[in-house]
């Protein structure tokens, strides 16, 4: 269908994998470079495993957005740095957030928090603070086009309530929110 988004796995990307594909079914054993070029020309997102395919498929369920400026909202610094690297390598921008609005947001967070982007509201951050940060990114930070929210559970905040806040904000925010939930296995009522 015209306009649909497609993700695909093409196995046999390594030399050994290509040999294995040839021995099983020769039709699949095309040069990896050719497959990459074909996928790129056709707008197909290449995935290298089932988990990645499922993740990309999930991302496709979110609305398309214009722009390249992403706010990363987190209570865990390490994952935010890794996401910053990954998004930057993919051609997206993680613009520095500063000025009066940023200073104002910082006063609403616990000491030690950072709002420069990534916005890190610490492991002790609350669901209410998460909601406030999302509101600022949605309505006060004009240079932001979308948000990635990383929220897991270091055991210091009620995760169920944080996920409820995140779900509500995803329904009402004007800018898209992409959740990254490393602790969904423990997301039930505490």
Annotate the PLM regions.
Residues 124-190:
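C-terminal non-catalytic interaction/assembly regions of soluble proteins
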Residues 2-3, 18-20, 99, 157:
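Short acidic/polar alpha-helix capping motifs at helix-coil junctions
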Residues 5-11, 15-16, 147, 156:
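Extended hydrophobic/aromatic-rich secondary-structure runs
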Residues 17-18, 65-145, 149-153:
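Short glycine-cluster motifs
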Residues 1-5, 46:
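Hydrophobic, well-structured modules enriched for small/aliphatic residues and gly/pro motifs
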Residues 10-94, 164-190:
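Peripheral docking tails and interdomain loops at the edges
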């Amino acid at each position: 269908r015209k306009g649909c988004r497609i993700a695909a796995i093409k196995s046999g990307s390594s030399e050994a994998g290509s040999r294995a594909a040839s021995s099983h079914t020769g039709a699949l054993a095309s040069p990896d470079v050719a497959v990459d070029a074909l996928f790129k020309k056709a707008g197909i997102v290449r995935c290298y495993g089932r988990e990645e395919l499922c993740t990309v498929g999930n991302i496709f369920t979110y609305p398309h957005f214009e722009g390249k400026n992403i706010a990363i909202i987190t209570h865990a610094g390490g994952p935010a740095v890794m996401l910053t690297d990954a998004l930057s390598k993919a051609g997206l921008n993680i613009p520095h957030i500063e000025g009066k609005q940023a200073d104002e947001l910082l006063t609403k967070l616990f000491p030690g928090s950072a709002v420069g982007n990534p916005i890190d509201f610490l492991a002790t951050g609350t669901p209410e603070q998460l909601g406030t940060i999302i509101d600022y990114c949605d309505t006060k930070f004009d240079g932001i086009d979308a948000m990635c929210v990383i929220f897991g559970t270091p055991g210091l905040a009620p995760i169920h309530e944080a996920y409820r806040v995140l779900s509500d904000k995803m329904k009402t925010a004007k800018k898209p929110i992409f959740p990254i939930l490393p602790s969904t296995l423990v997301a039930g009522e505490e």
